[in-house]
Amino acid sequence: MSLFHLILVALIQGITEFLPVSSSGHLILLPALTGLEDQGQVIDVAVHVGTLGAVVLYFWRDVRDGLAGLPRALTGRLDTPGARLAMGLIVATIPTVLAGAALHFTGLSDALRSITVIGWTMLLFGLLLWWADRTGAQVKEATDWSLRDALILGLWQAVALIPGTSRSGITITGARAMGYTRSDGARISMLMSIPTIIASGVLLGADVAVTSDAQAARDGAIAAAFAFVSALLALSLMMRLLRSVSFTPYVIYRLALGLVLLGIAYS
């Protein structure tokens, strides 16, 4: 795998992981449209580690509070904001873990990796994001996040296992439909990504430890570094823009890319 290809994969993952445009969809499209080889599990795990580091650093106060409240959450004592956050993230992650394991072990995840599927999901879920952002009230904040809302958003998040859906896009859509502000809906979505990325990395990396070599480890370190920097920049820019800009630019991008992909798929 060339250095150019390595950096390209890392940048695509880093930039698109937290934007509502589907990182997995873009990574599937890269070899399909360019003829480049698939990056493999080592690089997949590495870029996940990089993006995980970015979101943890950006939301480090929330992460600190959640970790501090985790012991209380595990014993059912939801009497602090940190404990409620930790329990909310646990509840929100369960549907995705169960659905992801089912798709992985049945082989259905591979069947969904096609340009046609990505094209349709880009279009359909882009329109759904536009509808939710246009019609959803902005009356709820992150402090209003309940276990009921966590479960609902967890079910939305499980849908993102279909390539092209976008994990951040579908959870932000759900949050906006439930009346969360753009900034707080995105904040909840980003925090939900942390246990999800960890679970995904564990699943992808099950065999990496015994199959990787020194070269693979070096490639992984490079990929993780570039993914970390690009993800942190993209996340910072998006959260800043959401103070004054809607999700319409991302919707337009999704619709344009979806139409191009369907044109390729059906030509």
From Swiss-Prot:
Q: Which UniProt keywords apply?
A: Antibiotic resistance, Cell inner membrane, Cell membrane, Cell shape, Cell wall biogenesis/degradation, Hydrolase, Membrane, Peptidoglycan synthesis, Transmembrane, Transmembrane helix
Per the UniProt entry, the disulfide pairs are none
**A Gene Ontology term for the protein's cellular component:** plasma membrane
Please report the record's description of how this protein sits within the membrane: Multi-pass membrane protein
Any GO BP annotation? regulation of cell shape
Q: What is its main location?
A: membrane
Q: Which GO terms describe its molecular function?
A: undecaprenyl-diphosphatase activity
**InterPro entries reported for this sequence:** UppP
The EC number(s) given in the record are 3.6.1.27
Location in the cell = Cell inner membrane
User: Which major enzyme category is it?
Assistant: hydrolase
Give TM segment ranges: 1-21, 40-60, 85-105, 111-131, 190-210, 219-239, 245-265
User: Which chemical reaction does it catalyze?
Assistant: di-trans,octa-cis-undecaprenyl diphosphate + H2O = di-trans,octa-cis-undecaprenyl phosphate + phosphate + H(+)
> What's in the misc comment field?
Bacitracin is thought to be involved in the inhibition of peptidoglycan synthesis by sequestering undecaprenyl diphosphate, thereby reducing the pool of lipid carrier available.
Which HAMAP family does the UniProt entry name for this protein?
Undec_diphosphatase
Name the protein family: Belongs to the UppP family.
> According to its UniProt entry, what is the function of this protein?
Catalyzes the dephosphorylation of undecaprenyl diphosphate (UPP). Confers resistance to bacitracin.
NCBIfam families, sorted: PRK00281.2-4
Q: What is this protein called?
A: Undecaprenyl-diphosphatase
Q: Which organism is it from?
A: Ruegeria pomeroyi (strain ATCC 700808 / DSM 15171 / DSS-3) (Silicibacter pomeroyi)
